[in-house]
């Protein structure tokens, strides 16, 4: 007995002794709690509350769940989950709280009402995805599982999952929507978590029914380096991981085969093949120019960055839309086609011009409304004129945008625009102090005014002009009456009220100055009914000379006055004028004597002059004669608050010039470098020079000698040092070294010979092995016995594959063809021509498997550039010969010291040169051997080809071995399942004996979906595989699909109109994989309505205990249902009409039928076919002849329409599918439904699911609740 078994028995004995525990202290007792109490407990997050709520949710019925959802229970859970995920998992308690919270969300989604409620709101799935932003791997695993289940649950769930990933990408500032999945997959080493991530990828890819959508989603993952990660994951020995990997590879192979079939043999996943096909298609047409232009434009788009990604996605959408419009654009012009391409469903976005028009109109309306309330002073309306609108010449916005409001006066607008100068500078810089929407300014002398709204600005005082208009080319026109203060700098006293509309306004640049209203300032006419706007757009007359006394207009100033008619209060913005030149009068309180010393400053806040001169201000009264003048004592202030004066330094005697301690004739930089060079030897200068004289290279390497050659003394330095006659001790260290070096005869030649001898040894050590390796690689290719045999095998296979084409009947091929063996894909997943060749070689020519040994020398020589190493050796030999010539002409001491050393280096270099000559000869032989051009053959490229082929060869061998091991494991799993099936106890009829409760079991949606995912999407693949085989020989019905009567509509006493017995083997052979069984429990009578049913048991979730644990080991998909009728009950006890199964009954068993309303009807579950459709009448007749089956099956009516049962996950969840997407079924429990068959697309089956009112239910009372457990098959 193992330790683990002993511990389990001890725990079991202890539990039996203690007896059943009434409650778990870690869970709140909410067995009979109402939804309101659970909602209140949710507002106090704790592990106890969440655990109790989970149990209540699992044991709840449909009505309770609906009340819980309607009272925002799911909202509270998701908000709590997002809040918990946001604060991290610094403590274990936080991690446990997150886990219990996500378990409650999973319990909600396990019910049909919960998952439908979540799918009804886009925000719920988005909130769920935000829980991924946590470091708790367990929480992320559960969230990913829920997203995967949503993907395969329904098309709506798949779309919401993709939307949630897009939302998560935006919230977390990621570049791609699948980045969160791929980053977790690449960084995690937790195998169960990796399996979950792969299941999410498979669910996202297999979710859509459209083939191109699946291929596009798969391409997105492949673009994020998914294939590289899968290659690494295949090395992990995990059964669940291998299931997901096989599911991905099988689906990928099937989709690629289908795409290639509908694309005329073009591999749509290969960029090169798609482009080659497209170029061949348009190369002989004018469209090739457009294609080239498009490609040139795409070259400028960067794929990185947020903007680049959006541009590529937008271009993809445009191309997809162009494909849709291609068949309907014959009679359209280019403009119409572009407009249709760029059209967007829904309300179009307004253009910038429309936005400007709208803003102008809105401002006008607001200004009119505010004017009617705020204007209290009557305004002047000149006789013969109309109220004025906001002039486009004076508006800071666009002239074009303002033209909408002044359309009634086109002539005035045209004249106003022509008066503008062409180069119009932006006006925003000249009006920084104005409100965001300044009103038009009063324009004097307008000829064609329009009725305007008044400005919404604070009311300015009239007649207070601030500055003159900006200087136009002509001077401003004369003003018939003098404008009060129109040309002054300082504001004059304000005139008596009421304010006049045409006084002293300045237009913003660049419009020219405008004339004022004639005689509008002299009198005060009665107020007009509507208040006019002071500004108006005039038509400037020919400009006469300026009036006498008028100041020429200064340059444009940053501000101007804005007169208004409200309350006589003025807000003035004047230009800053410097009065220090004496051009203007200075008040007495500003007349101070300048200080003679530099004074300390008083940190005050200076008031602007225009503010300080207000007539009611304190500062304005200082200039009146009645104010007494106060004069401070400036002298005392100057003494106290001046900076102390610096005392001049007394001239001191100049110090005597010191004699320098050292004498140097070198510049500072060279002296520093030489000192650094000498310090590395850690010895005296005499020792260094003695080593140079003796030729000792023990402390000199090549780099040191190269540095010494650069630091040798120059000609002028040598002359200065030789002319120095004083003591050498006065020289610096560097100069002393040079003096010692000059005493050595022929010191430059000695240093050069030392460097050549050391350098030659290094060159020989580096170049000689490479040259020898290249020579060996050439010889190995020329002498290999396996390479010609392998190439002969490839030649025969290639002639077989290319038979009948221009590439067939070949006598040989380029050696680079070996790299293309992996480009020829087989029908089997992950098997190429090279894989198959190696399998054949392993069977018939096992010696060829050692070819990688023959290719090892070329692989090692790959990357060696023969030309570079040859040139380096030749240059070194040339330097050696030159040094030998110099030594032979030198003194005998140098000859004796270096002649032999140089001769030995020269001989070694010449030997190396002979190796290069041999390499050149082998190159010519290799070019002749491989049928290559000797002038074009590159040894480096040839060796690189051999290295790449050797790597492919070795990898293919390993992959073949791994694939065999995986196939062996899969076979062992099948045998294990078969043995378990054989060990299952059976009754006398050969049917498995059922155990467990006799109550109806409700399907847990999420658990059933995840069980199918863990099995590798078996139901989905079964449905698709069966649909592909059946669709090829089926004739689509011409009549529209119609709902048929349920199979139970026949008279129960008469049985069915089909044969009562069928050969079981024949039926199984007809559809070997078309039927999946949902194992039923032992039938028991249904309780009557008068009796109280047993309380509903807790719906256990596989989050805590896998639901497969509740099944007996004999429950397998191959079991046959027991005879009789199997009525099916929904979650709330609503039973559908029973359905009989005549095709799967053993011989001699007749079908019995009971009415659905009979309370004694047997309960159970029935045999299902995931996403099944029946054969057409014609095909049924043909198949009936070969298999002796009746033309009308149990799931069909007389018209041949399919009424066979579907998967529970397809039918029991009514909102899960639309009428278009119907081929994905991923559940275990099944419910019969009325269904039709439609023909759509490429003859692939489609189901039409009726609405709820087409299903026939037999409702039970709420008191009769079935005992529910999760049945996962």
From Swiss-Prot:
Residues 433-516, 524-558 have a biased composition (Pro residues). Residues 359-382 have a biased composition (Low complexity). Residues 589-979 form the FH2 domain. The keyword Manganese does not apply. Residues 907-984 form a coiled coil. It is found in: Cytoplasm, Perinuclear region. It comes from the Eukaryota. This is Inverted formin-2. The gene is Inf2.
